[in-house]
């Protein structure tokens, strides 16, 4: 069995890789497509999750970042910069470290999961906090990158989209064709853009078919659904707490071209899906990821997703990215028992399986 060589080598023919592009990798890609056996029976569909939390820094951002950082290095850049709600900063810092580049990340004040911040710090990034939200941070780093010899690695960087589209290839490779529906969280909207690009390119080359693209924003940050910029977006799903998505137009096009839809889910629906996925399937994803599961559940109930459909839900990040949400949404009160085996047996026998 040959070792996975990373995206720049495995999907070279579909990527802007030249003889001069450094073949940077941390082993990103090749993430599992997990069938949801229990929930599929309950909902009457063939549901899978594309578990992007298995990437090196724990999120889908690694796919785009390896491409963006490799091209930055190829072009002679010495510094990369990004605005981030967390996952982008972790990926940029890791691949920046691997490539030997200086990395600067700008985060919204007090609005980032600690697991993600810890990663950026450990990888050696310079972390700056802005007194504002993600959209303010992105405005500043975009402006700086236009004036200084610093490479912006947010999803407005076209190389990010190129790397992220590879997940669509992997889904088609695993299933033998595209699913009927691709359900995906929408924050800055780069990922839905990338998946649609990937499905179209693979279909053109291999005849794998095209899915409906169904994207899900959090209700408190549903700029595309409401067709207006949300000045102060708010949601428990910090990774998609974005009120002015950079790839807004492309996301709308992806939904329209594929006969899909951009929809919204509430924080309550997201948290219910977050717990359901972990407790019914043993898959722990960060809250924002579970917008795709919440959306699937919502649209099965509404009849928009038909029974019997093959659906892939993208889980964008690992649950360990945001342990605080898990601890704050579920009561953690372990029973304290004496150091006595019989006491444990009595307790266990008295318990009723969930």
Swiss-Prot record:
Cofactor(s) it depends on: pyridoxal 5'-phosphate
Pathway: Amino-acid biosynthesis; L-threonine biosynthesis; L-threonine from L-aspartate: step 5/5
Catalytic activity: O-phospho-L-homoserine + H2O = L-threonine + phosphate
EC numbers on record: 4.2.3.1
Keyword list, A-Z: Amino-acid biosynthesis, Lyase, Pyridoxal phosphate, Threonine biosynthesis
Family in the record: Belongs to the threonine synthase family.
Name recorded for this polypeptide: Threonine synthase
């Amino acid at each position: 069995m040959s070792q996975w060589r990373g995206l720049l080598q495995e999907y070279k023919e579909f990527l802007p890789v030249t003889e001069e592009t450094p073949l940077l990798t941390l082993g990103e890609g090749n993430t599992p497509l997990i069938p949801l056996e229990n929930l599929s029976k309950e909902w009457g569909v063939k549901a899978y999750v594309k578990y992007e939390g298995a990437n090196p820094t724990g999120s889908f951002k690694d796919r785009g970042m390896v491409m963006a950082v490799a091209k930055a290095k190829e072009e002679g850049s010495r510094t990369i910069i990004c605005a981030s709600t967390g996952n982008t900063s972790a990926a940029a810092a890791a691949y920046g470290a691997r490539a030997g580049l200086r990395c600067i990340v700008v985060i919204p004040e007090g609005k980032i999961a600690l697991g993600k911040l810890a990663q950026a710090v450990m990888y050696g990034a310079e972390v700056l906090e802005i007194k504002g939200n993600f959209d303010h941070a992105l405005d500043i780093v975009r402006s700086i990158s236009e004036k200084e010899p610093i490479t912006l690695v947010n999803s407005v960087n076209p190389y990010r989209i190129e790397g992220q589209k590879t997940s669509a290839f992997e889904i088609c490779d695993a299933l033998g064709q595209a699913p009927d529906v691709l359900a995906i969280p929408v924050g800055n909207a780069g990922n839905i853009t990338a998946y649609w690009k990937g499905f179209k390119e693979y279909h053109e080359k291999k005849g794998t078919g095209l899915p409906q693209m169904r994207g899900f924003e959090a209700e408190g940050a549903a700029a595309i659904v409401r067709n207006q910029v949300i000045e102060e977006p708010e949601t428990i799903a910090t990774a998609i707490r974005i009120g002015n998505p950079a790839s807004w137009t492309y996301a709308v096009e992806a939904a329209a071209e594929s006969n899909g839809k951009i929809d919204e889910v509430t924080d309550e629906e997201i948290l219910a899906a977050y717990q359901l996925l972990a407790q019914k399937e043993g898959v722990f994803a960060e809250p924002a990821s579970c917008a795709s599961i919440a959306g699937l559940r919502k649209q099965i109930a509404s009849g928009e997703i038909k029974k019997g459909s093959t659906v892939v839900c993208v889980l964008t990040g690992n649950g360990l990215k945001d342990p605080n949400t898990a601890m704050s949404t579920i009561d953690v009160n372990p029973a304290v028992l004496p150091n006595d085996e019989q006491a444990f047996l009595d307790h266990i026998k008295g318990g009723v399986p969930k």
